[in-house]
């Protein structure tokens, strides 16, 4: 590596990692060794040596880590790296399935609560009651996990890639064996699958003569689990719904069977110790066969996610795969030596890490009195107060420092938070139910989601429930399903009180002349780019009327010769027209187009784009607007999505092929208009078939009350927001933040949602930390397009390392603290029985608790306090004496 090309911050251990350009490599690094920085430097190094962004893949465990990686890449690399995929494995799978048309375009992703709601509907149980009851909720999760288990069984996945093998319990096995013996069939995988698909038919087995009660209970539990798991699977399939684990399973199966899927020659994977077997298998399938560059980065000391399927053995496997290319980052750039001595001694003695492989510090700052302390409290209750007092002291003495109280359970966080609140200590709690998982915040995000994509059925379901149109998500889902069968959209009830979108189109198609048009432009920015060709053809009843219009327009903006990896046909045509003197000025061409349209409705494929770039060109060159002409606009993309809702792609080229329509999608406006007319004729045929059913449904006396409530509670808010989608904001507030605030205020004043005291955290984070790309116009539509997917993956922990957070005291669980860093850390209740947990049943669980303790300690950058209570009052009033966790034995000498 040329030294003058690189920042001096790279140390001698990091440089070989950055330079690695082929083969499989494993980087093992403790916290503070600069992993995120070298990930970004590797991208710069590879890019400078000709690796294309679209051939790179950067994967990590959490969305938060992916966002941090993206921010670091922006600082190190700069420029436009939008072709570079940075995200967690689920994000990659979602992007692949949707963008590559591998699943229907109207598919939606459901979260855990929505999955529970679906099953609760089959069980005739109150979905909210289930969510509030931990034990019932856990039972529902078992059903969901079992459905994935059966999917993997049916698709013959290797056992090591099973996501939830524990969902098929020993009792389940005994139940299946009994059924097989009773039915005289062989006990094997196919028998399990067969019983699963016919669970109700085997219910009589429970009542077999002579069957003991224990076996009967086993069979009953298994068969009901199978029945509801099958119901859940069928519901998802029928409604094009995918839960998060489906994203992994479907992607794995597609990549396993289709050699044409894109493989990546350059991959780096962070936090590899947290990935489960299926995620690693997917990464292997994504890897190009011909001499790939794959870099894994991890830390076996921080492997604490076994409850999500991660295994410590993963690093053992990767060490064998990467033999000869294992790198140890041995310079810690974050922790002072006195803290690193604590971490390293602990890693060596408790985690059995070779001392030679542990990092040294480049920070020789000496510890001052009290930087490392053990806090002894008389009781748990006293410990809450003592920790609060300590946190308050740190807060008052060190105005720039941040302090975290790290706990092992959500209930601990609640009690610490209560103690801090009592003394007026402002703090931020990251534990328990996440702010982004609360119904009110989900409702606000659903509002943004339907503005971004009005075909998002899950978001509409949440809105219908939240607007009190339906009492449950289950009823709202059924209503949405019926709308889909009838080519109706929920927005029809808000925009067309006695009609619907397809009916309005059909009326115009039959009774009026429609101008079908298309534009070719210098780019995709509707606010800044120019139209260079505009073409139009009039039709009535599907027949062409009069002469076509095809105008070429001069521009001073560059025209790209290539559109991605394809030639741009407009490049040569435009320059031919320019040489022949056949280009019109923008004002003349636009005025001729408006004259051609007159008062007729217009139609385009993906009309939102064409209409709004036309509107902005009119403003720029004619001091005019589309709104001033009050021209109705239809969109063949919206029409065909309503009328044929299960297609995988709605690009014009794909639709021509799918329906065998006349025309060619050449990206020349006049050709695209002719192709769109073919599609419009098909839409009219399909709309005609639905019209009578639509009218009957819209005017049905049982439907009207629901529609009226939805219209009354949401119609005005929705219409106002839709009208603002492409309006540039004139103030400094991001348009998306303004819309979120306006929706909250409207819903709250109407009594539709409760106060959200912490909404300001979200608004500040969006304003200061997320909506930072200055190339994205300050209008709602482009900001939604750029950010809505990221917004829907936010968690409270994202706030902790952000610029927007004002608090300097945090209360967090160990798992949510992972990846964060604080000046001061106080570990709560570090007593024997909590670390390791007294309820652990295996050595592996004790070892994971030891790693959890390491993760908690290593969040500290300056001070580390270990707290515990000398006594605890148990449930029945018995006082129990307690000892400091035995995990402290190797390092207690450093404290006090």
Give the ranges of each region predicted by the language model.
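P-loop NTPase Walker
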Residues: 1-106, 263, 344, 817, ...
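Conserved RecA-like helicase ATPase core segment
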Residues: 2, 45, 277-370, 374, ...
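Helicase P-loop NTPase motor core
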Residues: 26-39, 323-325, 332-425, 579-581, ...
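C-terminal accessory regions
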Residues: 682, 803-808, 831-896
